[in-house]
Amino acid sequence: MTDKVRIYDIAREMGRDSRDVLEVCEQLGIPFKTHSSTISPEQAELVRSKLGAPHIVKPPRPRPKPPSESLPPEPPAEAKVGERPQQKVPGTASAIVGIRRPAPAQQPAPVGEAKTAETLPAAKPSLSRPERVSPEKGSAGGAQLIGPPRRQVTPLVRSSEATQKPETVSQPATPPTPSESAAAKASGSEPSPVAKRPIVLSPPQRATSGTKPPAERPEPPQKAPEPSRPSPSEAPSPSHARVPQPAEEKAPSPPPAQRPRPQLVSAPVRPGTRSPATKEDSVSSGKAGEAPRPQRRMELVGPPTRPVAKPAPPEPDAASPLPERIPGERPSPVLVEAPVRPTPPKVKRKTEEEEDDELQALSRRAARVQAKRKRSRRRGEGDGDGLDLDPMTIISAVKQAELNALKPLARPTAKPPSYRPPAATAAPPARPRPAARLQQQPTSAEAGAADRASGTEPLPEEKVLLLDGSLTVQELAHRLRVAETEIIKTLFFKGVMVTINQVLDESLAESVAKELGYEIRRPKAEPEAKKTEMLDVEDIDHLVSRPPVVTIMGHVDHGKTTLLDAIRDTKVAQGEAGGITQRIGAYHVDVNFEGQKRRIVFLDTPGHQAFTAMRARGARVTDIAVLVVAADDGVQPQTLEAISHARAAQVPIIVAINKIDKPGSQPERIKQQLAEHGLLPEEWGGDTPMVEVSALTRRNLDALLEMILLVADVAELQANPNRPARGTVIEAHLDKARGPVATLLVQNGTLRVGDTLVAGAVLGRVKAMMDDRGQRLQEAGPSSAVQLLGLDEVPAAGDEFQVYTDEKEARRIAQERAEVLRQTRLQQALLSRRVSLGSVSAKAQEGQLKELNLIIKTDVQGSAEAIQTALRDLPQEEVQLRVLLAAPGEITETDVDLAAASDAIILGFNTTLAPGARQAADDKGVDVREYDIIYNLLDDLRAAMEGLLEPEEVEEPLGQAEVRLVIPIGRGAVAGSYVLSGKVQRNALVRVRRRGEVVYEGRLDSLKRFKDDVREVAAGFECGIGIDKFQSWQEGDIIEVYQMVTKRRTLASV
């Protein structure tokens, strides 16, 4: 393998990138795998000849590099050593300048040809190697390298540059050390390149160490006799250095020599004008090459920075055409940070409190100066004892330096913060704070500190607490603008132990707020059925008439669904469990009216009291409310609730008095009852249309439909079909075959297959749509009720949906809403374990409060909502209900696992069990109950809650006896008694009353009739009653006989 040559060795010898050599090998058909592959010497010669340079026999370690264009074949050896002395020799810097300018266009060949393009690709791989070689030898190599560069540079070198660089070269013995140390921090083995350019920066570094104030940059050069003069000029001359160094990268084609110089140049680049976003801008503006941070401090103070400006820098800036070529980023920050690091630790010993106090003192002092100046202007006094000065001038230089040091250290990406007078801004924001703390709301203590620092008194606030429900301790503290510990302490004195995240019920929060002097106000409750406006301003010019949406409302069993069946010629009511509607339905009906075919959309709502939310949802989206009242039953609670929903939604009401065909119906009585609740019939001079109908006999149905269309025409219902659809989710459920299915009511726009929509927090794409009769639709216009497939999850009934043209925006909105929903659920979970002063929390702490965990699975989302609403109405003083899961869909094995883990009961309402769920429930002992009527579900749930209640002992009276004769026996006495009522039993509990007062309570020990012991004596018989512990009988005493029995408690008795 010794006679073979590696591809990357050829690339290094030729000053080319390995990829160039690989391309040549590919062209010549030479097999290879990577740049580390070896080829024979004959193949190597072919490659070298193809690349256009003769082979120079050199071992790979020396890393021969062909110098610039006109050098003879020897330069590779000289190039190695030559890089080191370039710092010393006066002519090298000027020669480098000359080499750089031709370099970008040419690639120098190793022999002597004018090819400098090879240097550019080789610059990156050679950074580390030349740096190691250069520090060891500084002068010998320099003499050798001087010759070749001078020949090329002579036409391009300026006289000023030639004179300045000899001076800098003369210093390498001493100056290189600081520069090398600075560069060594950035790259451990890069001293030689750092020595070249830092030589230029070394005098400024001495100056920074010698003079603490950064503004006195010109002075340090004076300390050093020879180097100090060139150093200030060359402090801007980092730009000078930049020009030669890029040239040096290109002139020495071999990679090893080129990289150190770009890195050296990078150090001057930062002090120069290169980085606009860093604090080093001040150095680039013309000031000596000092560290940027001290300069920033002087800029903050203001006055000292002005004298520091120097006219010298423009010359080097003009001479630096190639600053962008400099790749070295690491050395530059090291050179800048080296002088800065020693200073901050001295000042940073102060704590944040001391910084606050100092800033506040300065702000107050500045405020006093401004106040005095204003008063002097008003009085016309012109004394200039510092009153005309800016508030910053009263700060001594020492204070300014301390204040500057208090500020956070400069970061390379951050802009230098401009100093503002402390009086103008609050003190806390000026201090560096952790980002996490800045995101939090300021505490009351911080707010007070800010007010004091700004010199302004906080305005007196009205101490009012808007209380809208249960709150956590943290939320209550924020609303009251007090510390959380204050709330916890107040509750502790009340005997309540809480943590910051615990939820306080409304009464407890109110008591805490009142104790802290706050007035309690409660927000005005908005009705559930408040209508949402779906039209936008842009729709006004494109409105067309739309069909009316009519909601059928009324009390249970008043014939709502039967009436709708009669209108639609269907038999929906016959298929309903228990003969009652338990879900909201949407239907279309086409009616011939005045020779035109008109469409009406009907929403059928449940009448049971548990389905309040469904009725409110129907009223919110409807245009007309049809109130069905049974003529034989009259106005009932849900009838009144429906009236309130319709009024809240501000929709017109049409009353349909149903069942007029039944005997005993009294339509006039119904009208009288409705008039008492504000619905006055039209024939009585009111504005409420009332139609007497019979659903079974189809009597007056046409009159009802005609009335609906007349009211709709008066309302002038309109929508814009030429826009993305908007509307409301009427109902939703999970179908095991089709997935999430939602019933949508399109209220504006047109919904099409393929649209992307967001319903509440659920994202989806319309895959298919069906109407109420199961026919597929491609689009649905305004006032259309459709079943939609394609949602990711089951949306909540009542959520509004909207179609978005941009899917990314829709996804973002859905994610934001989902996060809000998640927070709401967490709050609800906390509310289930709220703390109160009542008996509930006390019993819970004593372990007397029992919990019943439930998992509710229903056919549709609205049913789950209705069941949860009904559960909240049950008394929960001793048994609390915790709903772990309430969702539509079938009961799965996952639900069974959750129930087994949490000891919960699964309630299935109009749903089925998935395959395997029944077996899993039997194996794990989970109680799964299925219902199709909500009455039965609530009754069983109430019974289960009562079963968890501890049975109570109650007194059951047995009988009464009157003492007629006291019979003394031995030391005691026996009461000869007559049984007045009931019976008297031996060993029963007795209560002896004398003139209405109880004189003894105990147990009846002996009972005799004549001389025989008996177990009991019935009413109307005489007996002898003896009690061992009571002997003081008197005639006329009443003996009450009773027993204690355990009785099952009911929720009504709780």
Swiss-Prot record:
Location of the tr-type G domain: 545-718
Cellular component, GO, one term: cytosol
Biased composition range(s): Low complexity: 179-193, 421-437
Keyword Protein biosynthesis belongs to the record: yes
Compartments where found: Cytoplasm
Residue segments, region G1: 554-561
Record region (G4): 658-661
Protein name (database record): Translation initiation factor IF-2
Polar residues: compositionally biased ranges: 160-169
Biased composition range(s): Pro residues: 65-76, 221-235, 304-316
Role of this protein: One of the essential components for the initiation of protein synthesis. Protects formylmethionyl-tRNA from spontaneous hydrolysis and promotes its binding to the 30S ribosomal subunits. Also involved in the hydrolysis of GTP during the formation of the 70S ribosomal complex.
UniProt superkingdom: Bacteria
Key words of the record: Cytoplasm, GTP-binding, Initiation factor, Nucleotide-binding, Protein biosynthesis
Organism the protein comes from: Synechococcus sp. (strain JA-2-3B'a(2-13))
Gene Ontology terms for molecular function: GTP binding; GTPase activity; translation initiation factor activity
CDD domains from the UniProt entry: IF2_eIF5B (cd01887), IF2_mtIF2_II (cd03702), mtIF2_IVc (cd03692)
Renumbered residue ranges of the record's region G5: 694-696
Binding-site list for GTP: 554-561, 604-608, 658-661
Assigned protein family: Belongs to the TRAFAC class translation factor GTPase superfamily. Classic translation factor GTPase family. IF-2 subfamily.
Basic residues: compositionally biased ranges: 365-378
Pfam families to which the protein is assigned, alphabetical: EF-G_D2, GTP_EFTU, IF-2, IF2_N
Region Disordered, annotated ranges: 48-390, 409-458
Residue ranges, annotated region (G2): 579-583
InterPro entries: EF-G-like_DII (IPR053905), IF2_II (IPR044145), IF2_N (IPR006847), P-loop_NTPase (IPR027417), Small_GTP-bd (IPR005225), T_Tr_GTP-bd_dom (IPR000795), TF_IF2_bacterial-like (IPR000178), TIF_IF2 (IPR015760)
Residue ranges, annotated region (G3): 604-607
Gene that this polypeptide is encoded by: infB
